[in-house]
Amino acid sequence: MNLKELLNNIEAKIYGKVSPIEVRNLTKDSRNVGFGDIFIANKGKQFDGNDFSPLAIENGAIAIASSIYNPFLSVVQIVSSNLPQLEAELSAKYYNYPSKKLCIVGVTGTNGKTTVSHLIKTLFDGCNKPSGLIGTIEHVLGNNRIQDGYTTPESCLLQKYLAEMVKNRLTSAVMEVSSVGLVLERLAEVDFDVGVLTNITLDHLDFHGSFEEYINAKLKLFSKLPATGLAVVNGDLSYASRFLEMTQAQPITYGIECPADYRAMHLRSSPFGTDFDLVYRGESLPCRLPLIGKHNVYNILAAIAVAHQHCNGDLQQLISLAANVESPRGRLEPVFSGPCPIYIDYAHTPDALENVCKTLHALLPEQGKLIVVFGCGGDRDQSKRQIMAEVVERYGFAVVTSDNPRGEDPEEIIKAICSGFVKRNFSIEIDRKQAITYALSIASDRDIVLVAGKGHETYQIFKHQTIAFDDKEIVREVLSSHV
């Protein structure tokens, strides 16, 4: 597409002479700009992209998209007071509106987004509905897998990924939809067909300011759904009705405690999985899930509801597929399954930590204890630090350590966490590797060890550096050194 075609009917002020020169790419990173690119000069917390516009032009940019006009720039300028919306419009048009050619499933909620998205993709694929995935661990675009660190990528990347899915002849895209991504308008030009709500608990208050604003951000997904779409909501949530009232889409509920369209009853748990009866329209079907934890029953219910409704899938076929699913990396992932099982999990909110601790505590043999290695991320919601300690204290012994301290002092973060303990049933080890080593050294054959907070991550972020760090590899390293 050339620049003249791209800018035709775009809602923005255009400065400079627009020629039919071919557009090669849209990017927000001036270092990646080449000839024919449009540079999106975004103003972030640390850097102002407008400061890098001259470098982008030097590298070959043919146009600059910005929220301000700069009279000293020599190329076409596309100016809008709402730059995120402009970025979304330009990106969607440039890639020929790929979301209109896919079934787009958006999964939102505080916890469970990654697992539910992964399970929906698994069921879609099993029903011969090849799908892509946009999420925290990775983006699956067909044979191409990308890890860029975004749960919900910025518009110029998101539209590019969706276009690649179309090119690879996928029929669906399952997306994790973060509240931050919704507020920042990264999804402004994405046409959703299905919205899924997993749960709502405290998180991201550092960004949203209040719990009410956090809920309002999540509601944006459901307000985008068309009348022909599906709103799949956890009916056990106290906020469920707000989400269903917000949308014109067909309401579908799932749950365990309350009557729902898809309800799990008579849960039976073991170290190897969970059995339950799936009740749908008065019919009860036995289900076997090879994942542990009540929270994973909610996750598979959401996935089955989406696949059954949207793929017109056979319910018994979906139940058979569910019996063979795997959990995503770093989600209650067993690293060692012998005496004293060891798990890693991404749990970094009070609710997620409660779910995994409660699940593992129920599996303890008599006189066994749960040992939990955890910390809290720096430069993030500080209100949850004390609560995390309260959660762990209810279920076992805590080894408090560093997570991703970022710009904060790790000792200060740990001090805030420890203020939540009532008993002295915890230990402190700032170095995460040493904390894992210590936890394994004090564990007996009757104990279970949980290393929480980072899950699939392979790095640790400090103020002045990011180092390679993988909880799973550290556990394996410590175990091998003690063989």
UniProtKB/Swiss-Prot annotation:
CC terms in the record's Gene Ontology section: cytoplasm
Residues the record lists as binding ATP: 109-115
Record PTM: Carboxylation is probably crucial for Mg(2+) binding and, consequently, for the gamma-phosphate positioning of ATP.
Domain of life of the native organism: Bacteria
GO molecular function: ATP binding; magnesium ion binding; UDP-N-acetylmuramoylalanyl-D-glutamate-2,6-diaminopimelate ligase activity
Subcellular compartments: Cytoplasm
Cofactor: Mg(2+)
Positions with a binding annotation for meso-2,6-diaminopimelate: 380, 403-406, 453, 457
EC number: 6.3.2.13
Chain positions found as N6-carboxylysine: 218
Protein residues bound to UDP-N-acetyl-alpha-D-muramoyl-L-alanyl-D-glutamate: 30, 151-152, 178, 186
Pathway: Cell wall biogenesis; peptidoglycan biosynthesis
UniProt record, GO biological process: cell division; cell wall organization; peptidoglycan biosynthetic process; regulation of cell shape
Motif (Meso-diaminopimelate recognition motif): 403-406
Record field: catalytic activity: UDP-N-acetyl-alpha-D-muramoyl-L-alanyl-D-glutamate + meso-2,6-diaminopimelate + ATP = UDP-N-acetyl-alpha-D-muramoyl-L-alanyl-gamma-D-glutamyl-meso-2,6-diaminopimelate + ADP + phosphate + H(+)
Pfam families: Mur_ligase, Mur_ligase_C, Mur_ligase_M
Keywords: ATP-binding, Cell cycle, Cell division, Cell shape, Cell wall biogenesis/degradation, Cytoplasm, Ligase, Magnesium, Nucleotide-binding, Peptidoglycan synthesis
Family: Belongs to the MurCDEF family. MurE subfamily.
NCBIfam families in alphabetical order: murE, PRK00139.1-4
Function: Catalyzes the addition of meso-diaminopimelic acid to the nucleotide precursor UDP-N-acetylmuramoyl-L-alanyl-D-glutamate (UMAG) in the biosynthesis of bacterial cell-wall peptidoglycan.
PANTHER family per UniProt: MUR LIGASE FAMILY MEMBER, UDP-N-ACETYLMURAMOYL-L-ALANYL-D-GLUTAMATE--2,6-DIAMINOPIMELATE LIGASE MURE HOMOLOG, CHLOROPLASTIC
Annotated HAMAP family: MurE
Protein name: UDP-N-acetylmuramoyl-L-alanyl-D-glutamate--2,6-diaminopimelate ligase
Gene: murE
